[in-house]
Design a protein with these regions (language model features):
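Glycine-rich anion/phosphate-binding loop at the beta-strand->alpha-helix junction
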Residues: 1-98
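Internal helix-turn-beta structural module
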Residues: 84-162
Length: 162
């Protein structure tokens, strides 16, 4: 979980506001839109990571079918009011050997994060790559939810002309 003070100082908003933004945007909004995934933009992170590491780009659809949750924890003095967020990805199919992972730039990207090759035991590097992608996707979800909850998203787009 993320301490309340960290949420307030880093995101400029409260855990309650982020949890509310998640409910409205990711859960209710996605349901109304008929989406299969209930997340803000996991596909952006998954697609970028897949391209960079030589994954099968066609698997972005499955890899971004994710559910983001956010709730305020009231678990006593140690975690009172902290934000708990998670991202559940049902099927994140990655590999660290063969196919596009042999391309020079993609192999270098796998080297940079220390997951090129099968790993020990075999498959350990693929597991680690999946964890890295999921962690990055959760960070992206929190960033967007924080921007929505603090009303910074629109002003950032106006400032950057996007």
């Amino acid at each position: 979980s993320i301490p309340r003070e960290t949420v307030e100082s880093y995101f400029g908003t409260t855990p309650e506001a982020i949890a509310e933004a998640n409910t409205r945007k990711n859960l209710i909004g996605s349901a109304k839109a008929g989406a299969l995934g209930f997340n803000a933009h996991a596909a952006n992170t998954v697609a970028a990571a897949f391209l960079a590491t030589g994954q099968d780009i066609a698997q972005v659809v499955e890899g971004s079918n994710a559910i983001t949750t956010a709730e305020v924890r009231d678990g006593g003095p140690a975690s009172d009011g902290d934000l708990y967020a998670s991202l559940t990805i049902a099927s994140l199919e990655v590999g660290t050997v063969g196919g596009g992972t042999k391309l020079p730039t993609q192999a270098e990207a796998l080297d940079v994060v220390g997951v090129r090759g099968g790993g020990d035991p075999p498959g350990a590097n693929a597991d680690a790559l999946a964890e890295l992608i999921a962690t990055a996707a959760l960070a992206g979800e929190l960033s967007l939810l924080g921007a929505l909850a603090s009303n910074h998203l629109a002003s950032a787009h106006e400032e950057l002309g996007r």
